[in-house]
């Protein structure tokens, strides 16, 4: 009888430990807006509200858990079959709720406060990202890896990203600064200030964003201010088919150093506009184009 009673007490004790552990083994992650997201288990039904988020989730091994995505999520190809729940300014809240997500991942400057707050008001856990530097990306991988249970692959992705980033840094460290202008729209002319990830890429390559201190994040600038800044390299995103017409527009202002010397370059759009793992490929282009200017100057000495 004593033996049985002892076994019973041990069973009760160990069961209570297991129960306590299950109660307290919560997943807690802080997002880029300093909000804490708490999940009782890894998310398996995820809503991605932006294409960069979709790319990252696939990259860290959580793509199969995405049940809803924005209409621009087209990479990788597996993303094209996912249910569409939003565009950049409108979300289908009824559809999102019907998909019973256990996690929503949003992009602050891309989706906006209204959509994010509405989803939170509906009781959904929303992780918000807002990347302004390259160093934030491997950290983001690991945070999303925790939330999705894809910790092993996310750590490996973070390691590989950091290694490649460090290699780029070492290649261009100490190089002569090159005044650079990044155009995202032509009518009106718009650019990106120093708080945007693209500006960090330019700096990584030894460039200097001529509108570093402008405001807001995406400022509208006039041609007079560009002439005054006199960039040595002008960058934008677009296809090869657009290069000729784009350069032709700039040819009206030959007083700008970049125009006069022909240092105007287009980068494949998704590589720079999406804050995902492919930003490193975009950075390769930026660094090569800025380096062309340096080499051109060296050859003229």
Question: Predicted segments — roles?
Answer:
Residues 70, 195-218, 238, 265-266:
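His/Asp/Glu-enriched short active-site or ligand-binding loop at hydrolase and phosphoryl-transfer sites
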Residues 93-100, 122, 221-230:
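Short helices/loops that flank or line small-molecule/ion binding pockets
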Residues 32-34, 85-94, 214-223:
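Short helix-initiation/N-cap motifs at beta->coil->alpha
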Residues 50, 108-109, 184, 214, ...:
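Short secondary-structure boundary segments
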Residues 2-3, 8-15, 22-54, 151-181, ...:
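Bacterial Sec-exported substrate-binding components of ABC uptake systems
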Residues 91, 136-139, 143-146, 155, ...:
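Structured C-terminal subdomain patch of bacterial secreted/periplasmic proteins
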Residues 75-78, 111-143:
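Flexible loop/hinge segments that line or gate small-molecule binding clefts
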Residues 44-99, 103-108, 210, 238:
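A short, structured surface patch at a secondary-structure boundary
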